[in-house]
Structures are given as C-alpha cells and as structure tokens.
Regions:
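S-adenosylmethionine
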Residues: 1-262
Length: 262
C-alpha cells in the first residue's frame, strides 16, 4: 500500500518521468534576459531540469515524516521526495495526512512565523485548491479564524473538500468576489493572503502547455487584475494589518510594480 511505502523505510516510487524539454516563448526570453542578464542561462537550465516533488505533512493528524524525504529548509513540515508517487492511490493522501505542494509555496510559513504571534482573523483571498489555506490552518495560533475564499464556484468545491480533509474546524470556505468582501467586511481581517492569479511563468517547468498560454498582453492583463484585487479587498484589512502578496511569476509588472502600487 502506498500509504505504507511513503512513511516507512521501504519506499516504492514511480519511474522518473518529469524531466521536460522547455521551449520558452521568444518574448519571455527577451524580456527576462534583459531583466536577469547572465543569470538568465541559469533560469533556463532550471526550467528544463527535473520537477521536484514535495509534500507538506499534516501535524494535526500525527503524520510521520517520510523516511526517504529530504526536509524543505523553510518549512518544518515540508519534505522533498526522491521521485513522484501515484498519490491518487494513497489512502493517506485522501485522508488529509499530507498535501502535495511545491516547496516554494511553503515559504509562506516564514512570513506567518515572523509577523503573527497571537490569534488573528485571516483571509486567504484566492485560496483554491487549498495549499496555502491548509498551511495557514496548521500555522496560525490557536484561537485564530481562517476564511478561505475562491471566486470561481467550481474551484471552491475543490477547496472545501481539501479544507475538510485537512481537519481544522476553525476554517470557513466562501465563494465571493474580492469587492463583495471588501464592502461587506470592513476592517475585519488582521491578515490577508493574496496569491493572485498571474501569467504563470513559474508554472513553465511544471506544465509545458502553460508556455503556449503566455503573452505580453496576458502579463499586462494579470498585472491589472492583481491591482484590482488589491484595491477591492483593501477595505477588509484592519488598519495596521498584514497583507501578504504573492504570484507564481517572474516579471516586474506583476511583482515589483504591483508592490509599488500597494
């Protein structure tokens, strides 16, 4: 049984099939090389390397650390696996004993540990499928309230399922536009996490099809959407509260320029 294999000394993995050949969009290469200079070659090599597989275990369920896993340096419950398992056949996966998540997304833990020291009301604004929400549920101090929102209804069902499997009762799942939340819940949240929809440059290695969806126009659209989301939700943040802004992309329009906007 894979549940046994993952968390015991004998680990059985699928063959390595996650090395890809990357064909990057020309405009992306031109823009990113201008931004990174000589370091672009390192990025290009990294995007064609094996896709690391990482999981975050659920401390509430007493899940042991995988004996074949290397720890993620910035996440106490995060581990890299040597190769990818067929998680859909693992009952522990369906029971919420662990969550499959890219290690970079687990860096949220450092922000929470640095700035959240007492119970808070926290909003995960763009929460589906639930990686950051399940992480927040494990990290926030006892007595906190977590509200996980997903504006796309079909994705909100997936979010609700993952939250239920994770097993924290102090989490509410909602399906609202940021503007609705900002108007209805003024100054309610101590912490708002905004992992905003983006052009997905950070997804190139994981999903080769995403390169075909990338364009300069989409970068501009996503940058504008990110600012709209921040504008609409700002009223829900308490004065002096914490806003965590993140994307899975590299360009300055969606990252640094939107930070300047904030």
């Amino acid at each position: 049984m894979l549940a046994y294999c993952l968390f015991s000394a004998k680990v059985v993995f699928l063959p390595q099939t996650n090395r890809i050949i990357m064909a990057l969009p020309i405009d992306f290469i031109t823009r990113t090389r201008a931004l990174l200079g000589e370091e672009f070659d390192h990025l290009e090599a990294a995007l064609s390397a094996d896709v690391p597989v990482s999981i975050r275990i659920n401390p509430m369920k007493g899940t042991p650390a995988p004996k074949a896993g290397a720890p993620v340096a910035w996440c106490e419950s995060g581990f890299y696996l040597p190769e990818r398992l067929s998680f859909t056949f693992d009952p522990l996966f369906h029971a919420g004993a662990y969550y499959v998540q890219e290690a970079s997304s687990m860096f949220l833990e450092q922000a929470i540990k640095a700035y959240v020291k007492e119970p808070v009301r926290c909003l995960d604004l763009c929460a589906a499928p639930g990686g950051k929400s399940t992480h927040l549920a494990s990290l926030l101090p006892d007595g906190s309230l977590l509200v996980s929102n997903e504006v796309i209804r079909s994705r909100s069902y997936v979010l609700a399922e993952n939250i239920a499997k994770w097993g924290h009762p102090d989490t509410i799942v909602i399906n609202n536009d940021p503007e609705e939340i900002g108007e209805a819940l003024p100054h309610l949240f101590d912490v708002i996490v905004t992992d905003v929809p983006c052009s997905g440059e950070g997804m190139f290695r994981k999903d080769t099809d995403s390169t075909g969806e990338w364009s300069v126009d989409n970068v501009r659209l996503c940058a504008s959407r990110g600012r709209r989301i921040i504008h609409d939700i700002w009223n829900a943040l308490k004065p002096g509260g914490i806003l965590i802004y993140s994307t899975c992309t590299y360009n300055t329009e969606e990252d640094e320029e939107n930070i300047h906007y904030i």
